[in-house]
From Swiss-Prot:
Part of the ABC transporter complex PhnCDE involved in phosphonates import. Responsible for energy coupling to the transport system. CDD domains: ABC_PhnC_transporter. One of its GO terms (molecular function) is ATP hydrolysis activity. The complex is composed of two ATP-binding proteins (PhnC), two transmembrane proteins (PhnE) and a solute-binding protein (PhnD). Belongs to the ABC transporter superfamily. Phosphonates importer (TC 3.A.1.9.1) family. It is found in: Cell inner membrane. The gene is phnC2. This is Phosphonates import ATP-binding protein PhnC 2. Its EC number is 7.3.2.2.
Amino acid sequence: MLVVEGLTCRFGNHAAVDNASFAIERGSFIGVIGRSGAGKSTLLRMLNRLAEPSEGRILFEGIDVTALQGRELRQWRARSAMIFQQFNLVGRLDVLTNVLMGRLAHMPAWRSLAQAWPEKDRALAMSALDQFDMAPFAAQRADQLSGGQQQRVAIARALVQQPDIVLSDEPIASLDPRNTKIVMDALLRINKHFGITVICNLHSLDLARVYCDRLIGMAAGRVVFDGAPAELTDRVARELYDLEANDVMGADHHAPVVPTLPALPAYAQAVATG
């Protein structure tokens, strides 16, 4: 279980996240919703320790994540994989090498420096790419891919980390509706097939309702809603977005979305087990 207790992050006199508290069961798909500037990205970055909390604690299975340093902190970042809005791929490198970067925390330093990837890691990376129909692009430069393809590569990279948690920060913000569905289905797949907890920042309430088990709503850095998607009423939407409910609930501009979970190849379970 992931437990957040009174988590606060201040930049000067401004609290980007203010006294956030919640607990998340293993295997959940959590949507963090709210308008721009609500503190969603800062919250996810604190969970991974890319941003340092000013106050509060993060506990995972009894471990105080906020106290980790050095090697233990690097291990935590491997266990809590980040997926960014802008993909964070190395454009000049091929797709397979970008995915293999997710294995760096599992390798000795000399292998990392030489990029001497073990054959089992290469097989793991190819298996991850195959989950998202990206294996045919393994030898292609990452900067030659479309935005949706790059995001699928980023998800494959996160998967080969063999994480306990995937933290996805606005993964569909720059994607068209078709690629939005492909990427959200990919996140749902790693959640349902591999039992990995997914915490995903989303602007789209429609998508949040369809894909997520639970929603955490933020406004001005504070958690103002925590519940099932069915509990997200028009009144709550107005509080979260400071807009008329009709504007919020109808602003996604996506056709109705139905999640798709294609069957996995039998060998794909290697991604989960190593």
